[in-house]
A protein has these predicted regions:
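N-terminal accessory segment detector
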Residues: 1-117, 133-140, 149-150
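Low-complexity, intrinsically disordered Gly/Pro/Thr-rich segments
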Residues: 120-136
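Glycine-rich GHKL/ HATPase_c ATP-binding element in histidine kinases
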Residues: 143
Length: 150
């Protein structure tokens, strides 16, 4: 038997982010897969935690929600680009959001489309309670997100 010397890896910020991002996405996929394996849907999983974020957005409103979304999507995708904006509506794209899942079509019985639908539902429910519409669609440029005051 040989003795192995272990050492703590030295990671740069990009490597740390990639590991954290993969952990986050894999946990989302596992949770959706778990729900499906038990005869439930991604909606069941999303509704479980969505009630916790409603009070925050009721307090902070449209501008805060849009800023949060731009921040999140900028962190989680290769490129985020605003296509149009006004004081009541913004449309932006996020490219290469979880390209591994998009390329493989599914991981652990969960598709890219299901993850996008889950995210749309996750943000859409609290938005509806505070007078905001939220929609997502998959395009050739990535995911297009539309947020508007009702």
């Amino acid at each position: 038997m040989s003795q192995t010397d272990f050492s703590v890896p030295v990671l740069n910020d990009l490597q740390k982010f990639q590991v954290a991002n993969n952990l986050c996405m894999n946990n989302i996929i596992m949770a959706i897969s778990y729900e499906k394996a038990h005869g439930r849907t991604y909606e069941d999983y999303g509704k479980f935690g969505v009630e916790m974020i409603i009070p925050f957005y009721k307090e902070t409103g449209f501008e805060s929600f849009v800023k949060d979304q731009l921040y999140v999507w900028s962190a989680m995708s290769e490129k985020t680009e605003i296509l149009s904006q006004s004081e009541n509506k913004i449309i932006f794209t996020a490219s290469k959001f979880f390209p591994e899942l998009e390329a493989q079509e599914q991981i652990w019985n969960v598709t890219y489309s299901e993850v996008i639908k889950w995210l749309e539902m996750l943000y859409g429910i609290p938005c509806a309670t505070i007078g905001i519409s939220y929609s997502m669609k998959i395009t050739d440029q990535g995911v297009e997100i539309t947020i508007a005051r009702k």
